[in-house]
C-alpha cells in the first residue's frame, strides 16, 4: 500500500519513519510513504501557499491552486506507476472519528492521499472538488494535520504482517474484536514487588485458565468504569457470556470490588 502525504512540513515525518517497531513497515515497503510539499507547486519567488480569508477574520487560508497542482502530480505519478487509485483524505475536526474498525479497513486498503491542513484551514473549493473523506482524531484542534497523519500511518503499519515482534500482539489491543471490543487489562512485569506494591497473585500462579479469567474480568471492569458504552456494544453483539454478565451484575452490587 502507498500513502502520499501532502504537507508543508515534510521534515516532521523524518524521525517518525525511522523510529520504533513500525519503521519495519516503512523500510520494507509494506507501507510506502511519499511526502509532497505544496510549496513546490506554488508560483512566485516566495512560493506562497496561503492568503487572507475573504470576508476578514484572523489567520490565513491555504490556497486551492498549489494544493490542486500537487494532487494532480500525485495522481499522475500513481497512474504512470500502475498504483491503484485511492481516496483523498483531509484531517479535520468535522471529520468522522478514527477508530479501530477504521484502522483495520485502512490497513487492508491500497492506501490514500493524506492532506495535512495548516493555519485556518483549506480553501473550501479545494475540499469540495477533491476531498473524498475527512477524518478526525477527536473533539480538539491541532496546529496541523501532520500528527493526525502520523497517528493513522502508525496504526496501519502495526497491523501489517511481520511488523510487530509477536504476530498476535495487536489482537490483544484495546478495541480489537479478539477482545470483543473491550479495553485491555492491566499488565505487570518484574520485580514481583515494587515499592511495597505486589503483582496480583493470580498472575504468578501458573494456572492459565484462572489467569485468562482474571484478565477477562479486569477488561470488563475497566471497560465498564471507563467506557461503559463499549460494554453495551459487546452485549448487543452477543459477546458477553452468562459468566461475564454475572460478574458485571456483582460489580454493580459491590462497586468497591472495582478499585
UniProtKB/Swiss-Prot annotation:
Tree of life domain = Bacteria
Looking up Pfam families in the UniProt record yields: tRNA_m1G_MT
- Specify the protein name: tRNA (guanine-N(1)-)-methyltransferase
State a single Gene Ontology molecular function: tRNA (guanine(37)-N1)-methyltransferase activity
Q: What is its main location?
A: cytoplasm
Query: Transferase as a keyword?
Result: yes
Species classification: Bacteria, Pseudomonadati, Pseudomonadota, Betaproteobacteria, Burkholderiales
Output the Gene Ontology cellular-component terms: cytosol
Give an example GO biological process. tRNA N1-guanine methylation
Listed binding positions for S-adenosyl-L-methionine are: 117, 137-142
Question: What are the protein's UniProt keywords?
Answer: Cytoplasm, Methyltransferase, S-adenosyl-L-methionine, Transferase, tRNA processing
Its localization reads:
Cytoplasm
Q: Which gene encodes it?
A: trmD
Amino acid at each position: 500500500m502507498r500513502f502520499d502525504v501532502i504537507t508543508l512540513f515534510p521534515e516532521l515525518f523524518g524521525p517518525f519513519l525511522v523510529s520504533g517497531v513500525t519503521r519495519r513497515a516503512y523500510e520494507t515497503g509494506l507501507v510506502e510513504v511519499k511526502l509532497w510539499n505544496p510549496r513546490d507547486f506554488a508560483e512566485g519567488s516566495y512560493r506562497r501557499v496561503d492568503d487572507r480569508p475573504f470576508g476578514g477574520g484572523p489567520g490565513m487560508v491555504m490556497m486551492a491552486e498549489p494544493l490542486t497542482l500537487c494532487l494532480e502530480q500525485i495522481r499522475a505519478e500513481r497512474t504512470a506507476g500502475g498504483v491503484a487509485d485511492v481516496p483523498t483524505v483531509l484531517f479535520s475536526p468535522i471529520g468522522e472519528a478514527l477508530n479501530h474498525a477504521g484502522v483495520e479497513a485502512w490497513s487492508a486498503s491500497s492506501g490514500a492521499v493524506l492532506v495535512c491542513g495548516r493555519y485556518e484551514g483549506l480553501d473550501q473549493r479545494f475540499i469540495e472538488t477533491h476531498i473524498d473523506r475527512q477524518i478526525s482524531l477527536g473533539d480538539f484542534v491541532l496546529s496541523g494535520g501532520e500528527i493526525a497523519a502520523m497517528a493513522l500511518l502508525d496504526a496501519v503499519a502495526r497491523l501489517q504482517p511481520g511488523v510487530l515482534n509477536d504476530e498476535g500482539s495487536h489482537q490483544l489491543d484495546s478495541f480489537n474484536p479478539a477482545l470483543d471490543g473491550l479495553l485491555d487489562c492491566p499488565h505487570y512485569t518484574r520485580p514481583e514487588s515494587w515499592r511495597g506494591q505486589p503483582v496480583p497473585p493470580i498472575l504468578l500462579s501458573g494456572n492459565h485458565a484462572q489467569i485468562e479469567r482474571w484478565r477477562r474480568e479486569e477488561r470488563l471492569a475497566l471497560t465498564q468504569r471507563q467506557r461503559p458504552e463499549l460494554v453495551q456494544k459487546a452485549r448487543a453483539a452477543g459477546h458477553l457470556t452468562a459468566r461475564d454478565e454475572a460478574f458485571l451484575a456483582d460489580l454493580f452490587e459491590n462497586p468497591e470490588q472495582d478499585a
